[in-house]
Curated annotation (Swiss-Prot):
Biological source species: Xenopus tropicalis
Quaternary context: Component of the U1 snRNP. The U1 snRNP is composed of the U1 snRNA and the 7 core Sm proteins snrpb, snrpd1, snrpd2, snrpd3, snrpe, snrpf and snrpg that assemble in a heptameric protein ring on the Sm site of the small nuclear RNA to form the core snRNP, and at least three U1 snRNP-specific proteins snrnp70/U1-70K, snrpa/U1-A and snrpc/U1-C.
Location(s), subcellular: Nucleus speckle; Nucleus, Nucleoplasm
Protein name: U1 small nuclear ribonucleoprotein 70 kDa
UniProt biased composition (Basic residues): 246-259, 294-303
Stretches for region Required for interaction with U1 RNA: 92-202
Keywords on record: mRNA processing, Nucleus, Ribonucleoprotein, RNA-binding
Biased composition (Basic and acidic residues): 60-78, 207-245, 260-293, 304-321, 344-428
A Pfam family reported for this protein in Swiss-Prot or TrEMBL: U1snRNP70_N
Protein encoded by which gene: snrnp70
Length: 471
C-alpha cells in the first residue's frame, strides 16, 4: 500500500540508520578474573579469645521479677514519703484549720456539684453555722468531695452529728463525723496511714457490716429493709422462674401437639398418596384388560373373517369344479375351451384368482395391523396425557393442602400465644397486687412504729427516730 504513496511521504517511512556498536565498559560477571583465590581462616585462629578466659554469663531479670521489684520499690518509696510527711505534719499549726475544733463537723462523700449554699441550707436546720470550708484541689481547682462546717454552738454540732449522717444531698448520701485531727491525740489522716476507712465506727468487721453508720436502731431498721427487699427479690425471682417453667411447659406441649399434627398430616398424605397409587394401578389394570379384550376381540374378528373367506373360496372352487352332464359339449369346443391361445390351458384362472385373493387378504391383514398400531399409539398417547394431567392435578391438590395446613398451624399458634400472654398478664397482675398490698401493710407497720412518742421526735430530714437534743 505504501508503494503508491508520493516520494515526500515515502521518505517518512524510510528506516533509520542502525545503532552503532560500542563495546561494554565493564566485563560480565563470568568474564571477570579474580586476582587472589579464596583462602581459609587458619591464620586468624590464634586471634580468637580462649573460651576459658570468657566471663561467666549474667542472669537476666524476668518480667514477673521486674514487676515485683517495681511494686516493692513503689511501696518503699511511699513509706518513705509517709515518714517524711509525718515529721512535718502538725494539725494544730495548720493555717487552713481555723475556729474551734469541738464545734467543727466533718462532712464527706459530698457530690462534686454541691455548692456551699446548698450545704448551708441542709445543715442550718440543726443550728446557726459560723463558717463552711469546702476543700478544693490546689492544682486543678476541682472539689475534693468533703468539707468542714463550724457551728456557733457545740450542741448544734452534736445534733448534726447524730441526725445528719446518711442524709441524701444532690443524690448522694453524705458521711458525717467530728473533726479528729485536733481533738484526738495521735490521730493521723488516711493519706498518712491512719483514718477510719469507709466508716467512723472502728474495726474492720463493724465497718463492713454497718457501712459507716453509728445508730444501732438505724442499722437494725436498715437491716430489716434489706431483708425485706431481699425477700421481695427472692419472691419475684421465684415467680419469674415459675412463669418461665409454665411457658416452657406450654411451649413443649405446643411443640408436641404440632409434631403429632404434622405426623398425622404426613400419614394422611401418605395414605391418600397410596390410595391414589392404588387407584392408578387399578386404572392401569383396567386399561390393560381393556386393551387385551380389544386385542382378543380384534383377533377373533380377524379369525372369523378368515374363516368366512375360506368358506367362500371352498364354495367357489366347488361350484367351478362341477360340470352339467346334460349339456353336450362339442369336441372342438371342448378342445378350444381346454386350450387357450398358443396352447395355454385355461384351467389356470382359478389359481390366479386364489393368488390375487391371498394377496388381497395379506393387504387387508397389513391394513388391520397398521390400523391397530395407530389406534394403540393414539390410545397410549391419550393415556399418557391423561396420566400427566392427573399427576399435575394431584400435585396441585397436595400443594393446596400443604398451604392450608401451614396457614391453619400459624393461626393456631398465634391464637395460643395470644391466650398465653393474656393468661400471663392476668397472673402477674394478681401477684403485683398482693405484693403491693404486702408492701403497703409493711409500710403502715413501719409508720406506726415511727410515730412520735413522748421521749423522741420524728426527724423530717432522714426519717429516723432520734433522741431530743441536749439542752
Amino acid at each position: 500500500m505504501t508503494q503508491f504513496l508520493p516520494p515526500n511521504l515515502l521518505a517518512l517511512f524510510a528506516p533509520r540508520d542502525p545503532v552503532p556498536y560500542l563495546p561494554p565498559l565493564d566485563k560480565l560477571p563470568h568474564e571477570k578474573h579474580h586476582n587472589q583465590p579464596y583462602c581459609g581462616i587458619a591464620p586468624y585462629i590464634r586471634e580468637f579469645e580462649d573460651p576459658r578466659d570468657a566471663p561467666p554469663p549474667t542472669r537476666a531479670e524476668t518480667r514477673e521479677e521486674r514487676m515485683e521489684r517495681k511494686r516493692r520499690e513503689k511501696i518503699e518509696r511511699r513509706q518513705q514519703d509517709v515518714e517524711n510527711e509525718l515529721k512535718i505534719w502538725d494539725p494544730h499549726n495548720d493555717q487552713n484549720a481555723q475556729g474551734d475544733a469541738f464545734k467543727t463537723l466533718f462532712v464527706a462523700r459530698v457530690n462534686y456539684d454541691t455548692t456551699e449554699s446548698k450545704l448551708r441550707r441542709e445543715f442550718e436546720v440543726y443550728g446557726p453555722i459560723k463558717r463552711i470550708h469546702m476543700v478544693y484541689n490546689k492544682r486543678s481547682g476541682k472539689p475534693r468531695g468533703y468539707a468542714f462546717i463550724e457551728y456557733e454552738h457545740e450542741r448544734d454540732m452534736h445534733s448534726a452529728y447524730k441526725h445528719a449522717d446518711g442524709k441524701k444531698i444532690d443524690g448522694r448520701r453524705v458521711l458525717v463525723d467530728v473533726e479528729r485531727g485536733r481533738t484526738v491525740k495521735g490521730w493521723r489522716p488516711r493519706r498518712l496511714g491512719g483514718g477510719l476507712g469507709g466508716t467512723r465506727r472502728g474495726g474492720a468487721d463493724v465497718n463492713i457490716r454497718h457501712s459507716g453508720r453509728d445508730d444501732t436502731s438505724r442499722y437494725d431498721e436498715r437491716d430489716r429493709d434489706r431483708e425485706r427487699e431481699r425477700d421481695r427479690r427472692e419472691r419475684s425471682r421465684e415467680r419469674d422462674k415459675e412463669r418461665e417453667r409454665r411457658r416452657s411447659r406450654s411451649r413443649e406441649r405446643r411443640r408436641r401437639s404440632r409434631s403429632r399434627e404434622k405426623e398425622e398430616r404426613k400419614r394422611s398424605r401418605e395414605r391418600s398418596r397410596d390410595k391414589d397409587k392404588d387407584k392408578d394401578k387399578d386404572k392401569d389394570k383396567e386399561k390393560d384388560k381393556d386393551k387385551d379384550r380389544d386385542r382378543k376381540r380384534r383377533s377373533r374378528s380377524r379369525e372369523r373373517k378368515r374363516e368366512r373367506d375360506r368358506d367362500r373360496e371352498k364354495k367357489e372352487d366347488r361350484v367351478e369344479g362341477e360340470v352339467p352332464e346334460s349339456v353336450d359339449v362339442p369336441q372342438d369346443d371342448a378342445q378350444t375351451g381346454d386350450l387357450g391361445i398358443d396352447g395355454i390351458e385355461l384351467k389356470q384362472e382359478p389359481e390366479e384368482k386364489n393368488r390375487d385373493r391371498d394377496r388381497e387378504r395379506d393387504r387387508e391383514k397389513d391394513r388391520d395391523k397398521d390400523r391397530d398400531r395407530d389406534r394403540d399409539r393414539r390410545r397410549s398417547h391419550r393415556d399418557r396425557e391423561r396420566d400427566k394431567d392427573r399427576e399435575r392435578d394431584r400435585d396441585r391438590r397436595r400443594d393446596r393442602d400443604r398451604d392450608r395446613d401451614r396457614d391453619r398451624d400459624h393461626k393456631r399458634e398465634r391464637d395460643r400465644g395470644d391466650r398465653g400472654e393474656k393468661r400471663e398478664e392476668r397472673v402477674p397482675d394478681n401477684g403485683m397486687v398482693m405484693e403491693q398490698a404486702e408492701e403497703t401493710s409493711q409500710d403502715m407497720y413501719l409508720d406506726q412504729e415511727s410515730m412520735q412518742s413522748g421521749d423522741g421526735y420524728l426527724s423530717t430530714e432522714n426519717g429516723y427516730m432520734m433522741e431530743p437534743p441536749m439542752e
